C-alpha cells in the first residue's frame, strides 16, 4: 500500500524507530526485518502488545490483521527512509577502518588525534563509543564491532546534534557483508591487516577478503566535479556547487561546498575518497589491483609502502618510529609499544592529513596519543600485558614483539584460550604459535559459549605437539598461576579478551576482566599500582 512516512510519524505521534523486539518502546515504529538468525515478523504480536505506534513489514504471508500493521514492498527501504527523516544528521567527516586486527586501535588513534588538534571527535567500534572534547553522550550501545544501520545512525545523529564533526568507526567483515552500514559514505577508508579469522562465517579466506573490500567499493565517496554556482549566497560570493554521482543509484547530488564543508575540505571532496592500506598485508597486490579496477585511489603504509617505515627502536615502555614521507625522513616517539602499531599510527595520521590537516602537526601530536584499553596494555609497573590477540596473526605479532624486547635470560609466558562457537580451524594453529614463541604456555578458557571448553582446550593443545604447557580451565586461576611463576624480568602476556569485561559460558555472561584480575592479584602481592 502507498505510504507517507512523515505523515505517519505525525499521525501516530512516533517517538522512535526499532528493529529489536527486546528493546522496542511505546510509540516506536517497529520494522519487522528478517535477519541472519532471527525474523522480526515472528515478534509482531509481541510488539503490538507493547503499545508500539506502528509495525512495518514486507512479509505478505503474515495473517495479522491490525490497523497498526502496514505492508510495504521492501521493509529495508522503508527503514532507510525513516532513518533519513528521524535521524538525518551525522558528523561531516567520516573515516571507516577495516582489518583483521588493528581496527579498534586505529579508530581510537584517529579520534584522539582530532581531539588533540582541538576538534570534537568520536570513535565507534569493538570497545564502544569513545567521545573526545565533550561529555560522553551515548548509552546502551549494542555490543557489535559494526552496529546495525539504525543504531549507527542514532549515534551519529546524537553526535552531530552535539557539534561533533569528526567520527572514526570500525567496519567488520560481518557488518560489511550484511550491509549494516547502509548508504553511509566516508572520506577515507583504512585497511589495517588481513589474516585468517571468521572462517566459520565466510568459509574461505577469499570470501573473507572480498567482504572487507566492500568497504572501498560501497562506502568510499566517488570523485566529484565542480559546477559553477549562479547567484550570490550569504556564505560566499565565490561558492560553487559540488556534483557527485552516486555509483549505486546513478543519481547525482549537489552540495553547496564552501557553505557546508569549508575550504579545507574542498579538494578531497572533489577528488573522491582515499583508501589507506597496510603494505605488509600478504595479499596487498591483489588488493591494489582490485582497487585500481574500481578506479579507487589508494596509498600504502609499511615497510614497502608509499609511506615507508624504515626503522623502529622499541622497548617494553616506548618506541621510536622512523619513516619516509614525500621523500623526507621523519620520526616520532610513542608510548604505544609493538612495531605493528607503527603502521596503525601512520594510517591514522594519513587519514586525518587527507582531510586537510597539516601532516607535521599531526606527527607532533602522535607522541601524545595513548594506548587503547586491552591492546598491548601494560598493567601498572609490571611486565604483564593484556591484549585482545584472538587470531593467529595477532597472537604471533604480540608474542614476537615481547620476545624481541625481553632481556636475554628472561622468560616469555602466555595465558590464552579460544572462543567457543567461532572459527575452529585457528585453535591448533594458535597453540602451535604459542609453543614456538613463548617459553611457558598456559591454556585456559575464553568465552566457551555453548561448546565444551575441555574440547576447545584439546584442539589448542593438538597444535602444541611436544612443547611443555599447563592446562588450567579456570581463567582467573590460570592468570594467578602465570603471575606466581614469574621470575625477575620475566614477561607475561594474557591474550584473547583484551578490553572485554565478561566471560560467556553457555547463555550466561559473567563479569570478568583480565586487567582487573591482574591488578587485584598484584595488589595483594604489593607489586603493582592498582
From Swiss-Prot:
Cofactor: Mg(2+)
Annotated GO biological process: cell division; cell wall organization; peptidoglycan biosynthetic process; regulation of cell shape
Keywords from the named record: ATP-binding, Cell cycle, Cell division, Cell shape, Cell wall biogenesis/degradation, Cytoplasm, Ligase, Magnesium, Nucleotide-binding, Peptidoglycan synthesis
Ligase found in the keyword field: yes
Pfam families with a match to the protein in the record: Mur_ligase, Mur_ligase_C, Mur_ligase_M
Record-listed UDP-N-acetyl-alpha-D-muramoyl-L-alanyl-D-glutamate binding positions: 21, 145-146, 172, 178, 180
EC number: 6.3.2.13
Residues found modified as N6-carboxylysine: 212
Annotated residues for binding of meso-2,6-diaminopimelate: 422, 446-449, 496, 500
Gene Ontology cellular-component annotations: cytoplasm
Extent of motif Meso-diaminopimelate recognition motif: 446-449
Recorded catalytic activity of this chain's protein: UDP-N-acetyl-alpha-D-muramoyl-L-alanyl-D-glutamate + meso-2,6-diaminopimelate + ATP = UDP-N-acetyl-alpha-D-muramoyl-L-alanyl-gamma-D-glutamyl-meso-2,6-diaminopimelate + ADP + phosphate + H(+)
Top-rank lineage group of the source organism: Bacteria
Pathway recorded for this protein: Cell wall biogenesis; peptidoglycan biosynthesis
Binding locations of ATP: 99-105
InterPro entries given in the database record: Mur-like_cat_sf, Mur_ligase_C, Mur_ligase_C_dom_sf, Mur_ligase_cen, Mur_ligase_N, MurE/MurF_N, RPE1, UDP-N-AcMur-Glu-dNH2Pim_ligase
Entry keyword annotation includes Iron-sulfur: no
Similarity field: Belongs to the MurCDEF family. MurE subfamily.
Function noted in UniProt: Catalyzes the addition of meso-diaminopimelic acid to the nucleotide precursor UDP-N-acetylmuramoyl-L-alanyl-D-glutamate (UMAG) in the biosynthesis of bacterial cell-wall peptidoglycan.
Protein name, entry field: UDP-N-acetylmuramoyl-L-alanyl-D-glutamate--2,6-diaminopimelate ligase
Originating species: Rickettsia felis (strain ATCC VR-1525 / URRWXCal2)
Name of the encoding gene: murE
